[in-house]
Design a protein with these regions (language model features):
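Short, compositionally biased pre-sequence/patch detector
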Residues: 1-225
Length: 225
């Protein structure tokens, strides 16, 4: 398996990087746990390079475009979770920012381990631009999960037409929606796949089509209905 992986690297990684990778593998072939983490992170980096290239061409397809509907509530959530600095214009630390990414994704799925490419929109919404790969998962405390559940209820209560819907119902109809995220004129544009019942979006009382927070360098424009 390691041999096959190495052959793949030789075909896809620049020559100057191969020596560093070879040195690491030689030193850690007896530590399978650490080597596994290294390979996972390396694969994520390669996947993200592909995504970055796609952004400049045709955009990147995502499956959680509906997360933009609740984006306006995320700064409040991050503050209550204690992730933000005192002036609320940024995160206290990289650890808090990573937690914010995984907390955002909890509105999409309860899965704990999430491939980094699936977190692309959450990274945009949290202003995460570090080249360092994200961990496979991020454990959230019970009080953090409880605050997320409270926010789910608040979103449903504030959206009059969806007030009697379960969160699972909202997930299947709006949150887990396909879209294409693209960089246009130095800002983000998200074009969301439309469905017949998107007429309900007109009843949302808050803005979700232009998203900008203090920690986001670029505006996210949402094209949806």
């Amino acid at each position: 398996l390691l041999f096959l992986f190495w052959q793949h690297l030789r075909e896809s990684v620049p020559e100057e990087e191969l020596h560093k990778i070879e040195t690491f593998i030689c030193r850690h072939t007896t530590n399978l746990s650490e080597l596994s983490v290294f390979i996972y992170q390396l694969k994520n980096n390669m996947d993200m390079d592909v995504l970055n290239g796609q952004l400049e061409d045709h955009g990147v397809s995502i499956n959680n475009a509906g997360l933009t509907i609740i984006a306006v509530y995320l700064p409040i959530l991050f503050h209550r979770l204690g992730y933000l600095s005192d002036d609320r214009r940024g995160f206290k630390s990289r650890e808090c920012q990573v937690k914010a990414i995984f907390a955002s994704q909890r509105f999409v799925t309860d899965e704990k381990e999430i491939p980094e490419p699936e977190l692309f929109l959450s990274k945009v919404l949290t202003g995460y631009d570090s080249p360092e790969p994200l961990p496979r998962s991020c454990d959230l405390a019970e009080n953090e999960l409880e605050m997320i559940e409270q926010l789910k209820k608040a979103v449903l209560m504030n959206w009059d037409k969806m007030r009697n819907t379960s969160w699972e119902g909202l997930q299947s109809t709006f949150i887990r929606r396909k879209g294409v995220l693209k960089m246009e004129k130095n800002n983000w544009t998200l074009t969301v796949e439309e469905r017949a019942f998107d007429v309900l979006l007109d009843s949302i009382a808050w803005n979700f089509r232009f998203i900008k927070t203090p920690w986001m360098e670029k505006i996210l424009r949402v094209k949806w209905r």
